[in-house]
């Protein structure tokens, strides 16, 4: 299992969509170090294939991408619903033999 998270940059109205195998609060603290902007952990979503979900979220929001993993989201409150929606797609695909190899490589223990 892993965690996909949404962190808000309060000064720039941007959101980071990221993934961690560890504690998202520790990840926030690492990002905050040396960063003059105030960052806040908004949402976390635990799932079996966090790297796949993160990639799908980045693709979903590519039109509002600011820089790397930072996005200008209009409605960040939809993040958990979007995670659940995309995660259900991942769940349905993981049993498909054409996709199962990729999923086994990316799976976290």
Tell what function each PLM region has.
Residues 1-109:
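Non-catalytic accessory segments flanking enzymatic or RNA/DNA-binding domains
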């Amino acid at each position: 299992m892993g965690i996909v998270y949404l962190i808000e940059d309060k000064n720039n109205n941007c959101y980071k969509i990221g993934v961690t195998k560890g504690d998202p609060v520790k990840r926030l603290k690492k990002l905050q170090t040396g960063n003059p902007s105030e960052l806040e952990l908004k949402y976390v979503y635990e799932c079996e294939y966090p790297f796949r979900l993160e990639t799908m979220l980045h693709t979903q929001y590519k039109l509002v991408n600011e820089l790397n993993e930072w996005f200008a989201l209009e409605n960040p409150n939809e993040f958990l619903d979007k995670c659940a929606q995309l995660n259900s797609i991942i769940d349905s695909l993981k049993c498909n033999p054409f996709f199962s190899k990729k999923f086994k490589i990316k799976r976290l223990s």
